[in-house]
Amino acid sequence: MEKGMDVLHDFGIQSTHYLQVNYQDSQDWFILVSVIADLRNAFYVLFPIWFHLREAVGIKLLWVAVIGDWLNLVFKWILFGQRPYWWVMDTDYYSNTSVPLIKQFPVTCETGPGSPSGHAMGTAGVYYVMVTSTLSIFRGRKRPTYRFRCLNILLWLGFWAVQLNVCLSRIYLAAHFPHQVVAGVLSGIAVAETFRHIQSIYNASLKKYFLITFFLFSFAIGFYLLLKGLGVDLLWTLEKARRWCERPEWVHIDTTPFASLLKNVGTLFGLGVTLNSSMYRESCKGKLSKWFPFRLSCIVVSLILLHLFDSLKPPSQTELIFYTLSFCKSAAVPLASVSLIPYCLARVFDQPDKKSL
């Protein structure tokens, strides 16, 4: 088994080396793709856009992103996947030959296990939701037309082009092996397809959100403690990252498994509180909710404020404080974009009507 994995890992190293040698001019492009594919953009950019255009799509997108990333964490703890940038330095596979030279980049040194790829899984799930939802909107109940078939082909070509670029980016940056990105894409699609058949997420109560959030958090912590009690160190990758990363400043605490867990449960809890709040009902369910200028204003203001909010980084000196603030920050994203911003804008748009009276 170990020899088979070594051969698979060697193929990945050779793939990374080939891309880095033959596509040096594409370095900036691959880094940009990796940054855009970060799941944070689903929360801070795609969610507010889709929520205010099609509320149901926005809700499904957030659920797929959160549950997909949570499953990714569990899979990583089970599969113990290596990462190219440390495996190539740590393995005995090249004891009789020269070690392939693999470059590292500021976005290379993630601290969690490598399989499956979180970037590939998150991008596949989120973009699958957007493509299938867009096709569903344009198709409606009518018989498919020639234009719809063309749109269908274009969207799926775009979808697979995005997945290919994300996969190549993660391989180029030595963050993942090829089999890990393929597993990520397939897993992301599976999660998104599952949520196409789940309708209860659109009218879930605050109690249900709380119970699901509690389950996700307690299961992950319980699973971690169980394996730790059995002598399995699930934080083994932190030592690998700190040891083999080219520059210490490239190792970020916000890429650790627990940081991912707190962000996910915080986002889902924030969505539950928001969708069951009076501010949401007064603004997003009020008379202005169907007025396009109002919805467009909500999108623009949300994107601007969330961009500024995202630039605020929790202090990372103390892990407990960092994780707590990460939870609060993630919960504030849906709270701001779904209830607070629309509520304030609704008050602004209502002012002229009140003055005319």
Curated annotation (Swiss-Prot):
Residue positions of motif Prevents secretion from ER = 354-357
EC number assigned by the record: 3.1.3.9
Q: Which UniProt keywords apply?
A: Disease variant, Endoplasmic reticulum, Gluconeogenesis, Glycoprotein, Hydrolase, Membrane, Transmembrane, Transmembrane helix
Q: Which residues lie on this side of the membrane: Lumenal?
A: 1-28, 82-117, 169-170, 231-254, 313-320
Q: Which residues lie on this side of the membrane: Cytoplasmic?
A: 50-60, 139-147, 192-209, 276-291, 342-357
Which leading EC class covers this enzyme? hydrolase
Which Gene Ontology molecular-function terms are recorded?
glucose-6-phosphatase activity
* Listed SUPFAM superfamilies: Acid phosphatase/Vanadium-dependent haloperoxidase
Catalytic residue list: H119, H176
Q: How does it sit in the membrane?
A: Multi-pass membrane protein
For this protein, what reaction is catalysed? D-glucose 6-phosphate + H2O = D-glucose + phosphate
Per its UniProt record, what InterPro entries does this chain match? Glucose-6-phosphatase (IPR016275), P_Acid_Pase_2/haloperoxi_sf (IPR036938), P_Acid_Pase_2/haloperoxidase (IPR000326)
UniProt-annotated binding residues for substrate: R83, R170
Q: Which GO terms describe its biological process?
A: gluconeogenesis; glucose 6-phosphate metabolic process
Glycan attachment positions: N96
* CC per GO annotation: endoplasmic reticulum membrane; membrane
* Listed PANTHER family: GLUCOSE-6-PHOSPHATASE (PTHR12591), GLUCOSE-6-PHOSPHATASE CATALYTIC SUBUNIT 1 (PTHR12591:SF3)
Q: Which disease is it linked to?
A: Defects in G6PC1 are the cause of glycogen storage disease Ia (GSD-Ia); also known as von Gierke disease. GSD-Ia is characterized by hypoglycemia and hepatomegaly.
Function statement: Hydrolyzes glucose-6-phosphate to glucose in the endoplasmic reticulum. Forms with the glucose-6-phosphate transporter (SLC37A4/G6PT) the complex responsible for glucose production in the terminal step of glycogenolysis and gluconeogenesis. Hence, it is the key enzyme in homeostatic regulation of blood glucose levels.
Descriptive protein name = Glucose-6-phosphatase catalytic subunit 1
